[in-house]
Amino acid sequence: MNKKVVIGMSGGVDSSVAAYLLKEQGYDVIGVTMKLTPDDAFYTEQEGGCCSLSAVEDARRVAYRIGIPFYVVNFTDIFKEKVIDYFTEEYLNGKTPNPCIACNKYIKFDALLKKAESLGADYIATGHYCRIVEENGRYVIRKSEDEKKDQTYVMYNMTQDQLKHTLMPCGDYKKDRIREIAREIGLNVFDKKDSEEICFIPDNDHGGFIKRECPKAVKTGNFVDKEGKVLGKHKGIIYYTIGQRKGLGIATGKRVFVTNIDAMKNQVVIGEEEEIFENELISFKNNFIPFDKLTEPMEVDAKIRYNAKASKATIYPVDDENVKVKFEKPQRAITKGQSVVFYDGDLLVGGGIIK
């Protein structure tokens, strides 16, 4: 009997081709699109967003074309709680979160997996560019064949059980080849552009989104220097992030950057560029994939944000909750709330959230 797999389909080229590849490999494939955002005009009218009508229809058409059943599953409540509310609260606390990491942890590889298991499926699948491999009796994640498109950074929270029941067929291909396959089999999405914005904020206006969600929580405050001297007024801490230079709306006669955000005092600290370079950080909510726990110092390559270049570092266990990361060279704009992710060559070691 064929193994059954439920694949999350966004209407994009990657998940569409992933569904086709799995069917070709002999799996019984069921396509699902996850409804994540509320029934609200702001979300439903945003063309191209993850839950737009066009995305659902693209996924439905692909499923019909490749001959697999298709359903829409509703995860709006848990997505609101675990992703949208988390994103909003972190910004209001002066941090800069990565909602894709929260979505993967709680929605794609938890809620969707549980839903798939309830349908009697053996696996879930996605169109992510990662390779899941079993080595020495343990599941690990390695970078994809296409390093430019590699998405392992957002996968560091995965557990052994999740990895055991997850397939990511695109990880063995270059993106160009995925598009070629889509064209060869007659999928209209073969040239659909990649989505780069946060799925629930298609206009990319983070501040505007948070103000809409929590209008009373966004308050003006002071720009200050590191000594606390007031330099001007800011429009609300949600509009700023560490390392930001543009859009500050303050004239100081020199180039200045956001060096810290103090949510308790509702202050944005600004200073010289050299003040945004640091060579160590502490991470918490850490997860490791090749082993359960970090017990001794380890040399790694570490990334402090999705698009950052990995830099040489040593990670040290501090206690059950925290890991210290010491970089060989100072890093620009280490940002609270972002994730730091560790690699050993192409092996994803793990990661955590920057304190």
From Swiss-Prot:
Disulfide bonds join 103-199. The keyword RNA-binding applies. Its EC number is 2.8.1.13. GO terms for cellular component: cytoplasm. It is found in: Cytoplasm. Keywords: ATP-binding, Cytoplasm, Disulfide bond, Nucleotide-binding, RNA-binding, Transferase, tRNA processing, tRNA-binding. It holds the Pfam family tRNA_Me_trans. Signal peptide: none annotated. ATP binds at residues 8-15, 34, 127. The active site is at 103 (nucleophile), 199 (cysteine persulfide intermediate). GO terms for molecular function: ATP binding; tRNA binding; tRNA-uridine 2-sulfurtransferase activity. One of its GO terms (biological process) is tRNA wobble position uridine thiolation. It catalyses: S-sulfanyl-L-cysteinyl-[protein] + uridine(34) in tRNA + AH2 + ATP = 2-thiouridine(34) in tRNA + L-cysteinyl-[protein] + A + AMP + diphosphate + H(+). The record marks 128, 338 as: Interaction with tRNA. It comes from the Bacteria. The keyword Chaperone does not apply. InterPro entries: MnmA-like (IPR004506), MnmA-like_C (IPR046885), MnmA-like_central (IPR046884), MnmA-like_central_sf (IPR023382), Rossmann-like_a/b/a_fold (IPR014729). Catalyzes the 2-thiolation of uridine at the wobble position (U34) of tRNA, leading to the formation of s(2)U34. Belongs to the MnmA/TRMU family. This is tRNA-specific 2-thiouridylase MnmA. It comes from Clostridium acetobutylicum (strain ATCC 824 / DSM 792 / JCM 1419 / IAM 19013 / LMG 5710 / NBRC 13948 / NRRL B-527 / VKM B-1787 / 2291 / W). The gene is mnmA.
